[in-house]
Amino acid sequence: LVKEEDIVVDKDLFLINAETGSLYFAGGGTYAQIPAIDGHEDFIYIAGGGEAIGALSMLGGLYVVNQSTKQWELKYKDTVRAYGYARLARFSTGWVFYKGGGGDGKNYVIIVYDDGTVKERSVVGPVSNISTGPYDYCCVGASYQGGARIYTFLATSVPDSLTYYTPGMFTPSAVIQGFHSSPRSVVYSTTSNYTYVSTNPTGTQWTAATTRPQLTALTKGLYANEAGTNTFMLIGNNMKSVSTDGGNNWTTSTLGEYTLTDLIYVDSNWYAIGSNGTKRLLLQNTASTFDQSNK
């Protein structure tokens, strides 16, 4: 789910991707499937907002909407070897995503800047999550030899090599790049609800959360500075877990009747894709409760 300001017709649009990888535009009375792009209909990951809308084809690479022509353009694909692509995130001047599965045992984080510059950095294992946040900090969660390997760096000035830190021996189900007194990140695992918080902007030190989330599944992790609250949120099934103290203590509660499959926070509003068992619905709610009255 990505929110777009369509400056041509002056209305809000949302880019939505189905579980099959098909793309749709919805909003303002419009609901239309986007035809296959260069033959690809495997866009499992989308990111951005406003005038920067991107979609990542699992086999075809990164596509971005040209705001002048309103057409999708290929921004990155490895031309030497066939890789798979996943975990797309947007920062102020570019995109971050994972490249791997090329049969060479290599795993990479790719940074593509809006000016066309590309940076490729090696990581030790498959990437399960990427998150960008305030001040263009980026947190990457990878797995290697049974443990979480977390990379934190400034996306606008990526170092020549990335250094990981290990909060624990678990798979990082979600990483959330946020802010609490200073940039910090949260790593969460569905294994025993393990949750760790970085105690400095560069993610070199991690401490276990005092009160963990109590979720039975994970859909998404999100940071939103809602009314200055520095809110970290995890959602799964029809439950949410929220921290307002930098990720140290989490309060878990049940959402409304909908199971949320995606969630974003834009311009002081929460938007979600929810399912009631028979239909998928686009929901909006400033209080993040998502009940029947707010569909």
How would you describe each model-predicted region?
Residues L1-Y24, S288, N294-K295:
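Enriched but not universal
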Residues K3-D10, A32-I46, R81-S92, V123-Y135, ...:
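Repeated scaffold domains used in trafficking and secretory/extracellular systems
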Residues D12-L13, D42-A47, A52-G54, T93-Y98, ...:
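Entry beta-strands of beta-propeller and related beta-repeat scaffolds
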Residues E19, G29, G50-A52, G101-G103, ...:
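Residue-level signature of beta-propeller blades and closely related beta-rich strand-turn architectures
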Residues F25, Q71-D78, T117-S122, D160-G168, ...:
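A short beta-strand motif characteristic of beta-propeller blades
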Residues F25-A26, V64-N66, V112, F153-T156, ...:
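Conserved Ser/Thr-centered positions that define the repeating blades of beta-propeller domains
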Residues G27, G48-G49, G116, G141, ...:
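Periodic glycine anchor positions in long extracellular repeat architectures
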Residues S57-L59, G105-K106, G147, S192, ...:
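A detector of repeated loop/turn-to-beta-strand junctions in beta-rich toroidal repeat architectures
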